């Protein structure tokens, strides 16, 4: 017997119904991906919205945007980008997920809260006298 360690093999891809299970991240970037699990797709919409809120909060905080213009801009960009993503890029049937309104409002309030916190923190840190 040798004193060396046994080399562990990498884990095999998970099988789902006899087919290879595709990762969620590879589905997000492919326009022809099939979304079999409704909750998985709604999670993607939720986290995509959080990323948009984080990025826009930093941009709005660095730029001296204030008031209604900043909030309205966030709402339009956030809803618009996601609508374009799921209707034009993925070309999914919105009715399978409860309609366009359900997908548009999925995770909106939490992303709005995140946006406000990040916007206030960055604006205060950079522009506060």
Swiss-Prot record:
Residues 1-44, 85-103 are cytoplasmic. GO terms for biological process: mitochondrial respirasome assembly; multi-pass transmembrane protein insertion into ER membrane. InterPro entries: EMC6-like (IPR029008), RCAF1 (IPR010742). It is a multi-pass membrane protein. GO terms for cellular component: endoplasmic reticulum membrane; mitochondrial inner membrane; mitochondrion; multi-pass translocon complex. Expressed in neuronal cells. It is found in: Endoplasmic reticulum membrane; Mitochondrion inner membrane. This is GEL complex subunit OPTI. It comes from Mus musculus (Mouse).
């Amino acid at each position: 017997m040798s004193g060396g360690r046994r080399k562990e093999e990498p884990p095999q891809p998970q099988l789902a119904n006899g087919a290879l299970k595709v990762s969620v991240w590879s589905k997000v970037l492919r326009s022809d991906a099939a979304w079999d699990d409704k909750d998985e797709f709604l999670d993607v919409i939720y986290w995509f919205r959080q990323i948009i809120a984080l990025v826009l909060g930093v941009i709005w905080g660095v730029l001296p945007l204030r008031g209604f213009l900043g909030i309205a801009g966030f709402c339009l960009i956030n809803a618009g980008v996601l609508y374009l993503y799921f209707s034009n890029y993925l070309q999914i049937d919105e009715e399978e997920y409860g309609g366009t309104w359900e997908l548009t409002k999925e995770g909106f309030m939490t992303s709005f809260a995140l946006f406000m916190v990040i916007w206030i923190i960055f604006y205060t840190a950079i522009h506060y006298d």
